Amino acid sequence: DGIGFVRNLKEHGVDVKGKKMVVLGAGGAATAIQVQCALDGAESISIFNPKDPFFARAESTAEKLSKETPDCKVSVFDLADEAKLKEEVANADILVNATLAGMKPHEELTLIKDKSMFRPDLVVADVVYNPAQTRMVKEAKEAGCKLAIGGKGMLLWQGAAAYKLYTGLEMPTAEYQKFQEENENK
């Protein structure tokens, strides 16, 4: 997940190196993204998660990353603290939804309740790929964010990384992308 996420950003002209990030979520995909972005040189990662069993996991991830990647400041906050979320997003370069919010059959859900958090220089990325554009991505585009992308690219690039790992060969990604484009609205 982490490799696919970072590659998807790179394919859209965004490098995480030196960037301030806000990541919503602390599950498996979120943790992989946090770790990969820290390893790839993100300046800071602010993790927001509800005070559920995954919150302790987020705190553990932050502690480990602080030791392994001391140049990346990792902090954990309660998702219920909307003022802190707004503050952190205001200072972020990249906002990531790494939760199930917005995934079918709950397309109406978004964790960003205040659309004023979106601004033109903010990159918004979602791991959800069904639907191709979540409510968060749509609202970010409407607000004029320079880049707002769904999770299909992450899915492609994590698959390509796994394909190479298992076969030693490059996955024919152009063929897959063409197939996706042809079947997007079917």
Residue ranges of model-derived segments:
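NAD(P)-binding Rossmann-fold cofactor-contacting core
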Residues: D40-T69
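Glycine-rich adenosine-cofactor-binding loop
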Residues: G2, G18-A38, N49
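Glycine/small-residue-rich loop that forms an oxyanion/phosphate-binding "nest" at active or ligand-binding sites
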Residues: D1-K19
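Adenosine-phosphate binding glycine-rich loop
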Residues: G18, D121-V123, V127-K186
